């Protein structure tokens, strides 16, 4: 980046003159030294300052160099005078007027044809400076050019608004009115009224845009606000299912069916606010709270009445009542053993107690084993004991693991793994098989129930 050229003339300011002298003197001495070293020449520089001070630089002895310069006439002298560099005459000052620069920048480029190309105004710079006139902005009424030219239009003329079409262009051209207050007969306005005209035009553009926004299709808010006394906010977007025919319910089910809420389904109204905040759409503030409620057992008279949705609801209520009845009491298991067979079966593993050692071998009777607490080493789940195929006489202590039916001993073997959470069918939860072990030879390691 080069330095700008300055005008060579005497500096009138003392401070600027002193600074310029110091800088240029140092530069001159530096160049003289570089020249003497690079080119192997003798250089002597003498400067007499304005303060009557000599500033000298010499690559050799100054007195010897001056003696040779004055006395030796045989040496040629190449003398350069100030006229060899040209006569520096003061040029006319270039005055930068900010007001004129703004006028030139705001000059309107008028479109020469419908294609949008622009040409510079025919007025020259002298007429602009003398009269201060600017060409007036012209409204573009072409159907293919959707936009209005402004005083700050760039090189391609019209400015198109995004989303505008031919109908927007026709509406804008019909509603837009040029401001004629500041225009003169020559089709231009004075520069003094430039700012006011621009502000007025900006206000007019905002009014056009506001009118365009008002013409958009919107729902009738007056009818909606008139019915805003009750909080039916879903009426803004009506559901298409409201007009469908609804099935009729029999008279026996109308009084017994509550609102469809259970421990499995949580129903929240469409116009409720789950967070507990209020709606301020129409000025009123209402808060809604959705709580999960479990209704008591419902008595259904007849499950075959009513349409299919009602039957599904009745089935759901029956299932709910059944689950509540099961969960209210202890889990139980019904096991039916028709008769004992003499087929050879897998022998049951030995029963060990948690307190006794497996090495202890103590004989026990079936009655003692039924009364004892036993568990299988394969699983820590609880067993249910039965006697004489009687399902009502149950050992419900959860520790008995055998039964005595028709002189045969049966063991209840639970599945290996995690026991079921809810009672299931016997075929999938417990396997029952007879044992060929005689009742007199049964082994038990329970030290507390063993005979003395």
From Swiss-Prot:
Keywords: DNA-binding, Nucleus, Transcription, Transcription regulation. Its main location: nucleus. The gene is SMP1. Phosphorylated by HOG1. Residues 3-57 form the MADS-box domain. It is found in: Nucleus. This is Transcription factor SMP1. GO terms for biological process: cellular response to osmotic stress; positive regulation of transcription by RNA polymerase II.
């Amino acid at each position: 980046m080069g330095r700008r050229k300055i005008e060579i003339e005497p500096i009138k300011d003392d401070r600027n003159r002193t600074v310029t002298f110091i800088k240029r003197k140092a530069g001159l001495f530096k160049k003289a030294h570089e020249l003497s070293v690079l080119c192997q020449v003798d250089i002597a520089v003498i400067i007499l300052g304005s303060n009557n001070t000599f500033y000298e630089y010499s690559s050799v002895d100054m007195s010897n160099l001056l003696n040779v310069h004055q006395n030796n006439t045989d040496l040629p002298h190449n003398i350069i005078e100030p006229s060899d560099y040209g006569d520096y005459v003061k040029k006319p000052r270039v005055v930068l007027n900010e007001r004129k620069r703004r006028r030139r920048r705001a000059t309107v480029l008028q479109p020469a044809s419908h294609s949008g190309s622009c040409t510079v105004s025919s007025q020259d710079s002298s007429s602009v400076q003398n009269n201060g006139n600017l060409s007036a902005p012209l409204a573009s009424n072409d159907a293919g050019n959707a936009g209005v030219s402004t005083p700050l239009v760039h090189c391609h003329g019209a400015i198109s608004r995004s989303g505008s079409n031919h109908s927007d262009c026709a509406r804008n051209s019909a509603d837009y009115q040029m401001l004629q207050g500041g225009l003169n007969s020559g089709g231009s306005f004075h520069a003094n009224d430039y700012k006011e005209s621009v502000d007025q035009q900006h206000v007019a553009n905002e009014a056009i845009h506001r009118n365009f926004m008002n013409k958009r299709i919107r729902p009738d808010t007056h009818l909606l606000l008139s019915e805003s006394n009750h909080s039916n906010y879903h009426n803004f977007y009506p559901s298409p299912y409201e007009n469908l025919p609804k099935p009729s319910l029999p008279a026996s089910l109308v009084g017994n069916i509550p609102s469809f809420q259970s421990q499995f389904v949580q129903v929240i109204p469409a116009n409720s606010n789950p967070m507990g905040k209020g709606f301020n759409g129409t000025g009123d503030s209402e808060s809604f709270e959705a709580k999960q409620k479990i209704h008591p057992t419902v008595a259904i008279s007849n499950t075959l009445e009513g349409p299919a949705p009602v039957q599904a609801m009745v089935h759901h209520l029956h299932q709910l009542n059944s689950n509540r009845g099961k969960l209210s009491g202890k889990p139980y298991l019904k096991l039916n053993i028709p008769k004992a067979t003499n087929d050879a079966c897998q022998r049951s593993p030995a029963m060990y107690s948690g307190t006794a050692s497996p090495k202890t071998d103590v004989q026990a009777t079936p009655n003692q084993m039924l009364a004892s607490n036993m568990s299988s080493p394969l699983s820590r789940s609880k067993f249910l004991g039965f006697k004489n195929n009687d399902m009502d006489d149950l050992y419900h202590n959860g520790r008995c693991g055998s039964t005595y039916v028709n002189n045969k001993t049966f063991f209840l073997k639970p599945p290996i793994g995690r026991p079921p959470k809810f009672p299931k069918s016997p075929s999938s939860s417990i396997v029952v098989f007879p044992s060929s072990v005689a009742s007199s030879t049964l082994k038990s390691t329970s030290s507390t129930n063993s005979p003395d």
